[in-house]
From Swiss-Prot:
Record text on subunit structure and interactions: Part of the 50S ribosomal subunit.
Region of interest (Disordered), ranges: 1-46
Native organism taxonomy: Bacteria, Bacillati, Bacillota, Bacilli, Bacillales
Molecular-function GO term, any one: structural constituent of ribosome
Any Pfam family: Ribosomal_L27A
Keyword annotations of the record: Ribonucleoprotein, Ribosomal protein, RNA-binding, rRNA-binding
Protein name: Large ribosomal subunit protein uL15
Signal sequence coordinates: none
PANTHER family referenced in this protein's UniProt entry, alphabetically: 50S RIBOSOMAL PROTEIN L15 (PTHR12934), LARGE RIBOSOMAL SUBUNIT PROTEIN UL15M (PTHR12934:SF11)
InterPro entries xrefs: Ribosomal_uL15, Ribosomal_uL15/eL18, Ribosomal_uL15/eL18_sf, Ribosomal_uL15_bac-type, Ribosomal_uL15_CS
Domain of life: Bacteria
Length: 146
């Protein structure tokens, strides 16, 4: 086989349908758009969620909730992820970022209690769950809220 003998797989290449090119083509005159009406016009068509003039569902339902502008989003770290550090290490948010445990600092770091911790660490974070704090101290480590 040579480069000039290469051919596409059968059925993988289709010829484009040229609409509006004479009635003999089967797609002439109205070009598959039917007669008149909104969908026959250029740029015609209804917007997403349009229900033919009936009040759409998104307007029938009441508004609900709000966005708290003071919301804090914490970078979450579970206990089992802290086992990558050596015994006696002081774990800080900067160190977590450097080691790739978290990708972004966000509003701070929160330590959660999923998994086991086998190392004795001093963990500095912005928040701790009760179970995480308990587990770190049970392993002989310390927790410090910054």
């Amino acid at each position: 086989m040579k480069l000039h003998e290469l051919q596409p797989a059968p059925g993988s290449r289709k010829k484009a349908v040229r609409v509006g090119r004479g009635i003999g083509s089967g797609n002439g005159k109205t070009a598959g758009r039917g007669h008149k009406g909104q969908k026959a016009r250029s740029g015609g068509g209804v917007r997403l969620g349009f229900e033919g003039g009936q009040t759409p569902l998104f307007r029938r339902l009441p508004k609900r909730g709000f966005t708290n502008i003071n919301r804090k989003e914490y970078a979450v770290v579970n206990l089992d992820r802290l086992n990558i550090f050596e015994d006696g290490t002081e774990v800080t948010p900067e160190l977590l970022l450097e080691k790739g445990v978290i990708s972004k600092l966000k509003s701070g770091v929160k330590i959660l209690g999923k998994g086991q911790i086998e190392k004795k660490l001093t963990v500095k974070a912005h928040k701790f769950s009760a179970s995480a704090k308990e587990a770190i101290e049970a392993a002989g480590g310390k927790t410090e809220v910054i």
